Structures are given as C-alpha cells and as structure tokens.
Amino acid sequence: MARNEIRPIVKLRSTAGTGYTYVTRKNRRNDPDRLMLKKYDPVVRRHVDFREER
C-alpha cells in the first residue's frame, strides 16, 4: 500500500464557526470514522472541538 492510502492528510475545522483549520494525518485503520479532536482556536481564544472535513 502507498503511504498516502494508509495515512491521508485531513483538515480539521473548528466547530466554533470561526473557519480556523488544522491540517494533520490520520490512520484509517485505527480511525475509520471522522476525527474529532479538542484543540486551541486562537480566534475565540479557547479550546474547542475540531472535526474532520471531507
């Protein structure tokens, strides 16, 4: 398998509605569903949930 098939690059968009995004890689075998991570959003200056965007 190619490297990009196993660990594709995904965008994480803030659920606070600010439009702020993080870019990361995810492992499809361990996380077949959409990723949901709690990270810092500098626009609202607090930690919020970031959800994988397709």
UniProtKB/Swiss-Prot annotation:
Cite a single Pfam family from the UniProt record: Ribosomal_L33
Where is coiled-coil annotated?
Answer: none
- Name the protein family: Belongs to the bacterial ribosomal protein bL33 family.
Biological process (GO) annotations held by this record are: translation
- What is this protein identified as? Large ribosomal subunit protein bL33B
Q: What does UniProt give as GO cellular component?
A: cytosolic large ribosomal subunit
Identify the HAMAP family for this entry: Ribosomal_bL33
Any one GO MF term held by the record is: structural constituent of ribosome
Keyword DNA-binding part of the UniProt annotation: no
Q: Which UniProt keywords apply?
A: Ribonucleoprotein, Ribosomal protein
Query: Membrane-spanning residues where?
Result: none
